[in-house]
Structures are given as C-alpha cells and as structure tokens.
C-alpha cells in the first residue's frame, strides 16, 4: 500500500476493448488506446459546457459505450454523476428532482414514455423539482423532430443536443448537433470537438453538398483495430479515417 507500481502508461497504450453489437455478423472486439478515452471525456465536457456544478444522470448501463463516454464528461469537469437502474418515467423524474440533476441523457423510447406519462396524467410535473434541469441529451438512434416539438411543450427552457457515434470511434461525439442548432432537429450535426468528417463515394472521393455517400470520421477517438482481425480492420481504417459504413449527406 502506498507504493506506486513501476509501470508507465502513455496515451498510446491499450486501454479497453469494447464489442460491436453484432448486427451484421459476429461481434468484433474493438481495441482503444488511452488517448481515445481521454479525448471522449474532453469532447463530452466541451460539447455540453459541463462544470463542477453540473449533475449528470446516466441511465443506460455502463457496458454501453455511449453511456460510459457521457459519464466520463463528469470526470473531466469534476461534477457529480448519478447512475440510475431503471427507466420508468417516475423514477427518472424522481432522480432528477432528488439529485438535482442538470443534464440527463435519454434514449428516444424513454423520452416518449415520459411524455406519454405526462399526457396521460400518470405523472404530475409539479411534484418534482425540475427547474435546475438545463439539458436534455438524446441519441443512440434517429430522433423524430415531432418528439422534440412535444418535449419543448412541457420543458420549454431545456437545451437540446443529439449526436452520432459508434463504438469504433469511441461512442458519441464525433458528430453532434450542438445546443445552438435546435432548429436543425432531425440532422445528426457537424464534426465534434477535435474531429474531422467527410462523405465519400464508392471510389473514396468526397461528394458534393447534397449528394449521398459514406460517412467517414477522423480523430483521436478512432479505434486502434479490431483485435486480432487485421482483415476487418483494413476494410474500415484508411489513412487514419474510419469508414463507418453509414450513409449520409451534407445539407446547408
């Protein structure tokens, strides 16, 4: 006890292995360096302006890459993080009230459940202390603009942000909407802090604005490799760019 281990850790050392969901085949082991994890924490803090006074409510399980990366923002800011085991609307609102949460990360079904519970009278907002809740962050799937319109009806002062991310590029943050762009609800956003984004055709050439192509991202959060799978790695990593396999287009 009290003796520091004789080990030197650098940003480029291996830090963690995450697993893909396996939707297109067997799950792949995704190897990330310490640099990836640290950068993801900085990105989260930068995007949402987290400070020591913020309280972040994390509802998804921590084995989910996005949940872990959002939570890391609290480590950078020195703020408090609350982990909630359960997704019932009344549990979420009670946690926000009792823990005085300022930032809450929701998935689309959970936000819909909260709104449905409000509109059915199942929950009464005046029972809870919610005035400190400043930011509703939602993601991990497409967000219907109609959902945010409903949400603003009951929470008109909330900031809103969404993002695009994937485990190979350390979860959320490589593309995010930004709280200043609520008028662009339905879009995934622009390049996140420290990230580059491009959209390419089948030959790898950057497409023009408005044209459809493959979304590619580049930044400190890109994985090192698929562990022990060079073939799969070489298919998606090109000159530092991660070819996501997702289709996108750039608007104005």
Positions of the model-derived regions?
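Short beta-strand->loop structural element characteristic of the AMP-binding/adenylate-forming
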Residues: 28-31, 58, 80-86, 161
């Amino acid at each position: 006890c009290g003796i520091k281990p004789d080990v030197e850790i650098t940003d480029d050392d291996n830090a963690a292995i995450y697993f893909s969901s396996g939707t297109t085949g067997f799950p792949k082991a995704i190897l990330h360096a310490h640099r990836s994890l640290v950068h993801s924490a900085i990105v989260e803090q930068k995007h949402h302006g987290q400070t020591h006074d913020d309280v972040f409510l994390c509802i998804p399980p921590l084995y989910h890459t996005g949940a872990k990366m959002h939570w890391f923002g609290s480590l950078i800011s020195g703020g408090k993080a609350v982990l909630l085991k359960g997704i019932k609307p009344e549990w979420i609102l009670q946690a926000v009230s009792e823990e005085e949460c300022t930032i809450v990360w929701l998935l689309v079904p959970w936000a819909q459940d909260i709104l449905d519970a409000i509109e059915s009278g199942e929950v009464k907002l005046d029972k809870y202390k919610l005035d400190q809740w400043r930011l509703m962050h939602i993601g991990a799937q497409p967000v219907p603009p109609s959902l945010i319109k409903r949400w603003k009806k009951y929470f008109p002062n909330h900031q809103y942000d969404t993002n695009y991310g994937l485990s190979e590029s350390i979860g959320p943050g490589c593309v995010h909407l930004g709280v200043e762009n609520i008028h662009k609800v339905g879009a995934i956003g622009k390049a996140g802090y420290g990230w580059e984004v491009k959209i390419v055709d089948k030959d790898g050439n950057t497409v023009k604005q408005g044209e459809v192509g493959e979304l590619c991202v580049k930044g400190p959060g890109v994985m090192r490799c698929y562990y022990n799978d060079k073939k799969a790695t070489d298919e998606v990593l090109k000159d530092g760019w991660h070819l996501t396999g997702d289709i996108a287009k750039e608007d104005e």
